[in-house]
Amino acid sequence: MSISKSLVLNEIKKFSPSHIIIGYSGGVDSSVLLNISKELDIPLIAIYINHNLHRDSLKWQIHCQQTCQKYNLQFISHSLDKVPKGESFEAWASKQRMAFFQKIMQQYSKPLLLLGHHQDDQAETFLIQAIRGSGLAGLASIPHYKELHHGGVLRPLLKYSKIDIEGFAKLNNISYIYDDSNEDIKYRRNLIRNQIIPILQQVNPNISQTLSRSANICAESNNILQKLLTERLQSISQDTNLIISELIKLDDDIQKNLLHLWFKQNTQQSLKSKQIKELHLAVNNPSTGWQIDISNYYQIHIQYNQLIIKYPTTINDISKEDIISWLSKNLNEEIDLTKIVIRDRKPDDKCKYRGRNKPNKLKILFQELQIPTTERSKAKIILKDQQIIAVYPFFICG
């Protein structure tokens, strides 16, 4: 399928963005996206994320910068730190990239982030999620458009194949770089791209298109499911608690999905399959006082006819070592413990949430992040040089 420049431009324009942010790696996908998007009469900012892994990463950065200078586009580069021990590089780098994109987006009234994912990326992601044993939400893979806390992210090339994109680049004499680390099969995505997909193409030459279609079907089905479940959840909830007698009137599969949705809405965390099974068994044989530890911070209790989320300990039971460990994991930098102060929350405490220009009262941030009111009193304020740098166990400031 040939890329229609007019269709891509019209799709971007329908969001009426004040500014366009492009994740620009210099590869063929983002180079084509940049080449098309620069024709819009909308301020455009290209962002290059330097992962500092490849010997040519600085050359690529210079290439991207020079391309932006050629077209008189704003260019921003950002260098990632070393991945923390025990973290998956792919997952960590993805989070770091998105965090920086959103930090830049906060500066504008209605920003739209453009990413160059294509049909082959979608097929690879679908396989990755299938290998993990994911449900509908995971198999939906890469969303075409997603609302962010500030602005949105659009992938206008998602329906086009890599071959389509390379053909457009050749036809329009677009210069781009090639990252030979894409051949390194120690990374799971590269293994799937370079070894598994070619085998599947022997069975179905259009495998990427087929898997991409399956991902779209899963996304549509999941959207419908979530809307129906959300409506049902409201009818069997009392504040943040679940009414057990109403829940168990429903089919088992609906119960399990509602348990997962209920916990995620109230904690922003997901239950594991094993936890859902245990929880489902418990609500169908309810015993007041029953409880299960979900993570280091959450417990689920049965109290009479209600399912309740609680912290496993009171705030006074949480040691300074636990808080420092959490801070070290989330701050991704060395901490001078002599400069750290930990105290309880005060009514007028403010925090400049990551990516924002101005501080907000914690009450406002708690509301925006949908942190349950029952949990907010458990917050610990972490200060360095008299400045709030984090709110344990919820988020980092800065």
UniProtKB/Swiss-Prot annotation:
<dbReference type="GO" id="GO:0006400">
    <property type="term" value="P:tRNA modification"/>
</dbReference>
<comment type="similarity">
    <text>Belongs to the tRNA(Ile)-lysidine synthase family.</text>
</comment>
<dbReference type="Pfam" id="PF01171">
    <property type="entry name" value="ATP_bind_3"/>
</dbReference>
<dbReference type="Pfam" id="PF11734">
    <property type="entry name" value="TilS_C"/>
</dbReference>
<keyword id="KW-0963">Cytoplasm</keyword>
<dbReference type="GO" id="GO:0005524">
    <property type="term" value="F:ATP binding"/>
</dbReference>
<dbReference type="InterPro" id="IPR012094">
    <property type="entry name" value="tRNA_Ile_lys_synt"/>
</dbReference>
<keyword id="KW-0819">tRNA processing</keyword>
<dbReference type="GO" id="GO:0005737">
    <property type="term" value="C:cytoplasm"/>
</dbReference>
<feature type="binding site">
    <location>
        <begin position="25"/>
        <end position="30"/>
    </location>
    <ligand>
        <name>ATP</name>
    </ligand>
</feature>
<dbReference type="InterPro" id="IPR011063">
    <property type="entry name" value="TilS/TtcA_N"/>
</dbReference>
<dbReference type="InterPro" id="IPR012795">
    <property type="entry name" value="tRNA_Ile_lys_synt_N"/>
</dbReference>
<dbReference type="GO" id="GO:0032267">
    <property type="term" value="F:tRNA(Ile)-lysidine synthase activity"/>
</dbReference>
<keyword id="KW-0067">ATP-binding</keyword>
<dbReference type="InterPro" id="IPR012796">
    <property type="entry name" value="Lysidine-tRNA-synth_C"/>
</dbReference>
<keyword id="KW-0547">Nucleotide-binding</keyword>
<comment type="function">
    <text>Ligates lysine onto the cytidine present at position 34 of the AUA codon-specific tRNA(Ile) that contains the anticodon CAU, in an ATP-dependent manner. Cytidine is converted to lysidine, thus changing the amino acid specificity of the tRNA from methionine to isoleucine.</text>
</comment>
<dbReference type="InterPro" id="IPR015262">
    <property type="entry name" value="tRNA_Ile_lys_synt_subst-bd"/>
</dbReference>
<dbReference type="Pfam" id="PF09179">
    <property type="entry name" value="TilS"/>
</dbReference>
<protein>
    <recommendedName>
        <fullName>tRNA(Ile)-lysidine synthase</fullName>
        <ecNumber>6.3.4.19</ecNumber>
    </recommendedName>
</protein>
<dbReference type="InterPro" id="IPR014729">
    <property type="entry name" value="Rossmann-like_a/b/a_fold"/>
</dbReference>
<keyword id="KW-0436">Ligase</keyword>
